[in-house]
Amino acid sequence: MSITKEEVAEAVRAWCRAWDTHDVSTILAMEAQASGFGFRPFARRDQAAVGERGYLQMLERFFSEMEYFHLRLEDLQTAVIGEVGCAWGRHVEEFQEKGRPPERARVRFTKVLTKGTHGWQVLLYHRDIQPFGDDGRYPRSLTIVSPAPAAT
């Protein structure tokens, strides 16, 4: 079964809609076997290792801790290599955790997907929100290494 760039794009749009509408069953179907990096924790996430039930509980807990959560796709590019879909781009998350101030994150993402008998599956993903300056580059003020103090 051959996949197209357009099908990969529609799968990513469906993923975005599922997160925006809190459609836990669609998220679970697409991500239960995924592994990757999110922008909140530093450590790698492995949904397959926690199992479908464990991931379902994580999703339910995540949404229950939010006053609101919205995700809007901003930019999307896709490619297909054999039976593997690749997607990358940016989306915006607007959310407020209960008891905390509202937040807005412009997220860069990459996804590796495949289409099987149960629909689209995200295999690998990476999301980050590293700050960028007005010129679209990472601010050097965040990466400059301070000189070591002089030995006394």
Where are these regions (language model features)?
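Short, low-complexity N-terminal intrinsically disordered segments enriched in polar/charged residues
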Residues: 1-34, 140-152
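Short beta-strand edge/turn micro-motifs at domain boundaries
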Residues: 106-137
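A solvent-exposed, acidic/Ser-Thr-rich amphipathic alpha-helical stretch
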Residues: 5-6, 24-82, 103-104
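Hydrophobic/aromatic beta-strand elements that line small-molecule binding cavities or substrate pockets
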Residues: 59, 73-78, 91-93, 107-114, ...
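Short, well-ordered beta-strand segments in beta-rich or mixed alpha/beta enzyme
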Residues: 15, 30-32, 38-41, 85-95
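A short, hydrophobic/aromatic-rich structural module that often spans a beta strand
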Residues: 84-91, 133-151
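Solvent-exposed, non-membrane alpha-helical residues enriched in polar/charged side chains
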Residues: 9, 13-16, 56, 60, ...
